[in-house]
Amino acid sequence: MRPSDYWQDLLRPSILLDSPADMIVYGMGEQPVVEIARRLEAGEPVAAMTDVRQTVVRRRLDEVPAADAPDAIVLNSWRRCLRDKKAQAANFRHIEQQSNRLDGGVALWQAYDDMAVCVNPMHPAMTTAEIDASFDLPYTRQPHLRYRGKTIPAYEMIKFSVNIHRGCFGGCAFCTISAHQGKHIASRSRQSILREVKQVAAMPGFKGYLSDLGGPSANMYGMHGKDLSVCAKCMRPSCLHPKPCPNLNSDHGPLLDLYHAVDALPGIKKSFIGSGVRYDLSMAPTGDARTDANNRRYNRELIERHVSGRLKVAPEHTSDSVVNIMRKPRFELFRRFKEIFDDVNEQAGLRQQIIPYFISSHPGCHEADMAELAVMTKDMGLKLEQVQDFTPTPMTLSTEIYYTGYHPYTLEPVFTARTDAEKQAQRKYFFWYDPACRADLADSLHRLHRPDLARKLFPGGVPRGRAASRQPADRRPPKNSRRKR
């Protein structure tokens, strides 16, 4: 059960079979590691530990359950997936659905040539007491000693930040959070979070500013299903797409209360939200007057009090068909959120920026979609910097579509730009405002028979036929053009 290798463009066997390891612990590993340690201490050999949740183990072929076993799913064999990419796509649907089950799902089995691999179910999301116990351990909050005296840019970015929850129910097709943490939120208690904030405030070099109070998504703290019996039956990969689940308690009130408690601590001048905000969550009407009022208040307080000059959000694309595959909201919702952002800034006398992230060459995206993206973002006065070309990453729906050519939930074919030329043709539309790109883009729009878009992008007109002399083939994006995913 391993995704394709991007560099080789091959479907590899399970990483367990490619390594000398006896067992793999996957996901957030506190619970399985503790269980393994206790069983080892009791004298149990590793070879006998075949039932530990969140582990992957080798099994004999004669141990593979029957296809109709109630407590297991037998996936298409690795050999069959090598022959039939549609079989691999079908496998992924089971993998994603089970990783998002409230109870952790069932075991997944896959046969190889002379043995089988069993992926034991995930643990259910941690309780508040369990996640507090993990976060309250006496961490040093310092890099490893081998880096003493060296600057680590990633550490500098997060050293004064606090993680307040795990899990994400956004279900973005290109994200691996569900594979690591699941979609159900495990929230720390306010007391645990405040203890850590006090520790951060006492760190050398702290000047009163928390860089982030966040998580995989910034604004899912304390959220869960209203009726957990409904959640227990649910296998939706996203609680927000195609529209927010009516069973979701999306009240941002507890999160606002947490922000207020943190900001009231001695030594805290301001707490910023550096994690990505799901504006489709805070803007979705719920029908509950109190929740809707809290969510409107969240948007205002977030923009007015918790932005360090730039607010990061991720519309990712403007095309309805592309964002549907991505499991992201329609671009129109970003327009509405930007209007709120601009209004709050004007009323508060602030000069903050909203920084949208976009992806080119995502499965389902055609060059014409990127041309329309360029026009739509130009019309909004945006010159994009935080962008990336889609790169396959393990355990994501998008990567399965990229490799197999099929959508795992429909098994219908999906176009994906795969060659360097196809990907470069899409990516260049991000930089329509760069004079070095204009002639090449004008030629491309002529090839696409879209003079309407050419006139909108370049109302003054751009002569065609000079692309080769105006833009090197290996042109790089502007510096700091996209954060890592």
Task: Show which residues each predicted segment covers.
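Conserved SAM/AdoMet-binding glycine-rich loop
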Residues: 199-355, 359-363
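Conserved, mostly hydrophobic/aromatic
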Residues: 22, 134, 168, 172, ...
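N-terminal [4Fe-4S]-dependent radical SAM core
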Residues: 90-161
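Glycine-rich beta-alpha loop elements in corrinoid/cobalamin-binding modules
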Residues: 1-112, 119-120, 124
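Iron-sulfur (Fe-S) cluster-binding segments and ferredoxin-like electron-carrier domains
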Residues: 175-192
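Acidic, low-complexity intrinsically disordered tails
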Residues: 231, 237, 460-485
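N-terminal pre-triad scaffold of radical SAM enzymes
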Residues: 150-176, 209
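Catalytic cores of alpha/beta
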Residues: 362-378
